[in-house]
A protein has these predicted regions:
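Acidic-leg catalytic submotif of subtilisin-like serine proteases
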Residues: 11-23
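A broad, structure-centric signal for solvent-exposed, well-ordered loop/edge residues
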Residues: 35-37, 46, 51, 95, ...
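Short, low-order "capping/linker" segments at domain edges
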Residues: 218-219
Length: 219
């Protein structure tokens, strides 16, 4: 645990020196034999409680370096057998199975201030939408069941796991309950088109951001 914390502390110091204050890590996804290599060694293993503890240590290491961690990919990407950069990942596990495994690392660390959704479709909750675009998963599972009340950012909305155009994805992710919409590919036209009709940042999102900064500066 200390090795993990120290390793992420050193990563955080490097990022800080480069002027980067937020890191989209650590990964709290559980590793299965069938897990797609896109998760790979970013996962801390197959035991949900070990993943929980090591993920927490990684988050603390980044915090100690002055960098905000983002735990991902809530509510759990480990069961997916495809790469969500190119294909929509679908999870058919029951809620009972998910509660005994994939949900645990996120629920155990629900007090962390920042999380990123996975573009995973939980058929048992919402068979029609991936998490990023699903109010049923975001409000029903992430907010209510897991009790995560921090800042929620989407995974990259340019990824092919999602339907429709990028501007439509932005609208849908915010409507579903994401606080922030992430676009990583630098397509300026997409970005301009995406912000035309989006609502102003809500007071709740501002409160969550303020809480994130308070957490970073706390002992």
């Amino acid at each position: 645990m200390n090795l993990t914390r120290n390793n992420y502390y050193e990563i955080g110091l490097t990022l800080k020196d480069l002027g980067i204050s937020v890191n989209a890590a650590p990964v709290f996804d559980i590793q299965y034999q069938s897990t797609h290599e896109v998760i790979g060694d970013r996962s801390f293993g197959s035991d949900p409680y070990a993943v929980s503890v090591l993920g927490r240590a990684a988050a603390e290491g980044l915090k100690n370096a002055g960098v905000i961690p983002i735990m991902k990919h809530i509510p759990g990407h480990g069961r997916t057998t495809v790469d969500s950069h190119f294909n929509p990942p679908v999870i058919d596990a029951s809620l009972k199975e998910l509660r005994k495994s994939d949900f645990i690392p996120f629920q155990e660390n629900s007090d962390l201030p920042f999380a990123m959704t996975g573009h995973v479709q939980l058929n048992v909750v919402d068979p029609n939408h991936p998490t990023t675009l699903s109010s049923k998963v975001i409000e029903g599972i992430i907010r209510d069941e897991m009790q995560f009340q921090g800042l929620l950012i989407s995974d990259c909305l340019f990824m092919d796991a999602l339907p429709n155009t990028v501007p439509e994805r932005v609208q849908a992710s915010l409507k579903a309950g994401c606080d922030l919409a992430l676009h990583c590919h630098g397509n300026i036209d997409d970005m301009k088109n995406s912000i035309v009709d989006i609502p102003p940042i809500s007071s709740k999102t501002k409160e969550r951001w303020d809480s994130t900064l308070e957490w970073l500066n706390s002992k």
